[in-house]
């Protein structure tokens, strides 16, 4: 029997670590948390200083029994759960269940699961850090008090199965606020004038800039005609040439948030999938003869700090592969994470290149590892150097400007370029070599009419970025928060963008009226700051909870008394039940709308419903536009009020009217190209990506 017992969260992690520690150590998994607040009741005594009532999680009895059996036989028990607040809390709960001494130095932490890192951590065990535990307890108790007080009110007044929470309610608010911006958006007309110019055999484009040495806004066609009629022939002169050298630095290595964003954009991974695959890479991959090794550092972090050892190894790799001129000369500028001295997400060894690892990884593991590896190595490389040139092209009072850039030294861009929404700005645009006084010929002057566009709906990547920018939640909360608002049917995804549902808007309005603090961004940010202060030992967790609950309790009492019961009426489905002949109605279920017999519970007939696209019928303005299929299985769009309304369209209506003729706009797909066009006139615009 091994003298030393080591407890970690997962079997994969246990398997990897046991190989490093040898026969004197037995490593077993707790399978995550073993204790938590009960699901059947509040589990927090608000009359006894918010004392939590922890119980063994249902189904974990056999695990706990096994842990106790091994702990009883071992001389030493080490708690090696993850190196964050959640991991610290798991270690504390294990110590309580196993009745370990509070002052015992039995907590080991490592940021990467490699032989050296694990062995080093066992040389320096420490006591459980209660400040970190208390910060996690405070978050858990806060979320319990909010959820278990608001949810019953929503069940009673709106619909069973609903929930609200500190982070999820703010995320829902962001989606709804953006939708309201789109609904209230009034498009404004504007014009641009682009010129094509020729110098010798070279052609290049430039945009209208100034009239009479001042910016001149082209709001209407009349403004455009003022410029075009002022032009005299096709001869222009280069009146100014500005050349600059621009340095572009690489992006920092990944944090949890930036990894989720970039994986969504480059790999089309959802946040939950990104974290699942990252966990596999962290906990260990079987590299056959090399053994099982964790390929990346811990994946829940808000730090961009990099250890000196990792920097030195990256520098060695870059020098050998690209030459010394490609290594970074910059001093470190990474931010320190709020939770503790974590590192950024990086490969545990730069020398384990994606190509070398490919045969050991699944397709998803390889793609994510390659992304993490390239981002990290690029972060340690020299900046790119761009030569930029700006040309002023003038005729009389009219000035056009052309901007160009070429890459002088690729630096980190040899390996990796961060995805940007404005990716066109990264492309090379060569201009002919021109000097002040040179003459050029305009071969084409092209005015174009445009209309301002509403702000785009949130993609998952953009929502994660906004939550991080606002300091809402923590790295570990982004993925489950986004999952929750979808599972509750508060939002739905359309073309990879979030749209609020009717139910989501109803819940939001009730929470906004009766629990304004819960959806207040500033309140949520302040609460995160207080949780950080608990972790730092500057304030007690009970004081933070009491400061919140004393006013929140009054909000709950007011909501119970004043919130009116909202009846979400069943919509008529427009057809009769084929079982009993009663009218069918449309009901809202966990996974969206479905048809059910109005004679329930006597008749339990249900059936799937045609898919609503969330747009009102542009013909009758009463029904919803629904997706249907023709006899040849081709998708078309019709009105849910059919046959009373015979609206039909092969193209998908988008819920906005044409700014030119006020007819409805549709999304038109031709091959791989999608654009928004008017159903009536020649108006068109780019589709939201």
From Swiss-Prot:
Tell me the InterPro entries matching this sequence: Topo_IA, Topo_IA_2, Topo_IA_AS, Topo_IA_cen, Topo_IA_cen_sub1, Topo_IA_cen_sub2, Topo_IA_cen_sub3, Topo_IA_core_domain
**Top-rank lineage group of the source organism:** Bacteria
Give the GO biological process terms. DNA topological change
For site (Interaction with DNA), what residue positions does UniProt give? 33, 139-140, 143, 148, 155, 300, 488
Q: Know the name of this protein?
A: DNA topoisomerase 1
Kindly state which keywords UniProt assigns to this record, in alphabetical order.
DNA-binding, Isomerase, Magnesium, Metal-binding, Repeat, Topoisomerase, Zinc, Zinc-finger
Residue ranges for the region (Interaction with DNA) are: 163-168
Answer whether the UniProt record assigns the keyword Kinase to this protein: no
Name the coenzymes or cofactors required. Mg(2+)
NCBIfam families per record: topA_bact (TIGR01051)
The family database entries (Pfam families) matched by this protein are listed as: Topoisom_bac, Toprim, Zn_ribbon_Top1
Query: Matching Gene3D superfamilies, A to Z?
Result: 3.40.50.140, Bacterial Topoisomerase I, domain 1, Topoisomerase I, domain 2, Topoisomerase I, domain 3, Topoisomerase I, domain 4
Active site residues per record: 298 (o-(5'-phospho-dna)-tyrosine intermediate)
PANTHER family the UniProt entry points to: DNA TOPOISOMERASE (PTHR42785:SF1), DNA TOPOISOMERASE, TYPE IA, CORE (PTHR42785)
Annotated spans, Disordered: 328-357
**Topo IA-type catalytic domain boundaries:** 129-557
Any single Gene Ontology cellular-component annotation: chromosome
Q: Which GO terms describe its molecular function?
A: DNA binding; DNA topoisomerase type I (single strand cut, ATP-independent) activity; zinc ion binding
Organism of this sequence:
Staphylococcus aureus
Q: Where are the zinc fingers (C4-type)?
A: 577-603, 617-645, 658-681
Physiological role: Releases the supercoiling and torsional tension of DNA, which is introduced during the DNA replication and transcription, by transiently cleaving and rejoining one strand of the DNA duplex. Introduces a single-strand break via transesterification at a target site in duplex DNA. The scissile phosphodiester is attacked by the catalytic tyrosine of the enzyme, resulting in the formation of a DNA-(5'-phosphotyrosyl)-enzyme intermediate and the expulsion of a 3'-OH DNA strand. The free DNA strand then undergoes passage around the unbroken strand, thus removing DNA supercoils.
**Gene that produces this protein:** topA
Enzyme class of the recorded protein, top EC level? isomerase
Task: Indicate the family of this protein.
Answer: Belongs to the type IA topoisomerase family.
């Amino acid at each position: 029997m091994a003298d030393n017992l080591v407890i970690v969260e997962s079997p994969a992690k246990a398997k990897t670590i046991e190989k490093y520690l040898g026969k004197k150590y037995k490593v077993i998994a707790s399978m995550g948390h073993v204790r938590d607040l009960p699901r059947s009741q509040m589990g927090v005594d608000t009359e006894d200083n918010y004392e939590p009532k922890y119980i063994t999680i249902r189904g974990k009895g056999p695990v706990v029994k096994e842990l106790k059996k091994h702990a009883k036989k071992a001389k030493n028990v080490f708690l090696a759960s993850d190196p964050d607040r959640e991991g610290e809390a798991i270690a504390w709960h294990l110590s309580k269940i196993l009745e370990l001494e509070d002052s015992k130095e039995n907590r080991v932490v490592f940021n990467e699961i490699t032989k050296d890192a694990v062995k080093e951590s066992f040389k320096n065990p420490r006591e459980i850090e209660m400040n970190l535990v208390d910060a996690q307890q405070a978050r858990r108790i806060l979320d319990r008090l909010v959820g278990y007080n608001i949810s019953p009110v929503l069940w009673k007044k709106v619909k069973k199965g609903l929930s609200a929470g500190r982070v999820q309610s703010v995320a829902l608010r962001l989606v709804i606020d953006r939708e309201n911006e789109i609904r209230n958006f009034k498009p404004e007309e504007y014009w641009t004038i682009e010129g094509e110019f020729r110098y010798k055999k070279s052609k290049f484009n430039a945009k209208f800039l100034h009239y009479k040495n001042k910016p001149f806004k082209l709001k209407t066609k009349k403004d455009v005609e003022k410029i075009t009629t002022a032009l005299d022939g096709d001869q222009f002169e280069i009146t100014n040439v500005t050349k600059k050298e621009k340095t572009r630095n690489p992006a920092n290595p990944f944090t949890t948030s930036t990894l989720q964003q970039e994986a969504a954009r480059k790999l089309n991974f959802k946040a939950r999938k990104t974290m699942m695959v990252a966990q596999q890479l962290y906990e260990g991959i079987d590299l056959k003869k090399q053994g099982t090794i964790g390929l990346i550092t811990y994946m829940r972090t808000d730090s961009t700090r990099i250890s000196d050892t990792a920097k030195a190894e990256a520098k060695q790799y870059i020098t050998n592969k690209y030459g010394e001129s490609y290594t970074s000369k910059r001093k470190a500028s990474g931010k320190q994470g709020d939770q503790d001295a974590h590192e950024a997400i990086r490969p545990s060894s730069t020398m384990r290149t994606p190509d070398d690892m490919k045969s050991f990884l699944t397709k998803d593991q390889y793609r994510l590892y390659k992304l993490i590896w390239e981002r990290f190595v690029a972060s340690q490389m020299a900046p790119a150097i761009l030569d930029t040139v700006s040309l002023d092209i003038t005729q009389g009072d009219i000035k056009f400007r052309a901007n160009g850039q070429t890459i002088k030294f690729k630096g980190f861009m040899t390996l990796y370029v961060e995805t940007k929404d404005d990716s066109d700005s990264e492309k090379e645009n060569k201009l002919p070599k021109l000097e002040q006084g040179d003459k050029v010929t305009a071969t084409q002057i092209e005015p174009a009419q445009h209309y301002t566009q509403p702000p785009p709906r949130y993609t998952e990547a953009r929502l994660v970025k906004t939550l991080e920018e606002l300091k809402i939640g923590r790295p570990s909360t982004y993925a489950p928060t986004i999952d929750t608002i979808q599972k509750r049917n508060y939002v739905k995804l359309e073309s990879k963008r979030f749209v609020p549902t009717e139910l989501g808007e109803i819940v939001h309005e009730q929470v906004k009226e009766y629990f304004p603090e819960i959806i207040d961004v500033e309140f949520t940010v302040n609460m995160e700051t207080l949780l950080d202060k608990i972790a730092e030992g500057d304030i007690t967790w009970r004081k933070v909870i009491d400061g919140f609950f004393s006013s929140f309790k009054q909000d709950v009492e007011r909501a119970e008394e004043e919130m009116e019961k909202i009846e979400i009426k069943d919509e008529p489905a427009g057809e009769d039940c084929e079982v009993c002949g009663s009218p069918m109605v449309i009901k809202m279920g966990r996974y969206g709308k479905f048809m059910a017999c109005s004679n329930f519970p006597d008749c339990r007939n249900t059936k799937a419903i045609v898919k609503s696209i969330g747009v009102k019928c542009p013909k009758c303005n009463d029904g919803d536009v629904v997706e249907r299929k023709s006899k040849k299985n081709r998708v078309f769009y019709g009105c849910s009020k059919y046959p009373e309304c015979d609206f039909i369209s092969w193209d998908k209506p988008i819920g906005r009217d044409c700014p030119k003729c006020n007819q409805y706009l549709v999304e038109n797909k031709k091959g791989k190209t999608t654009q928004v066009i008017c159903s009536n006139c020649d108006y068109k615009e780019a589709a939201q990506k």
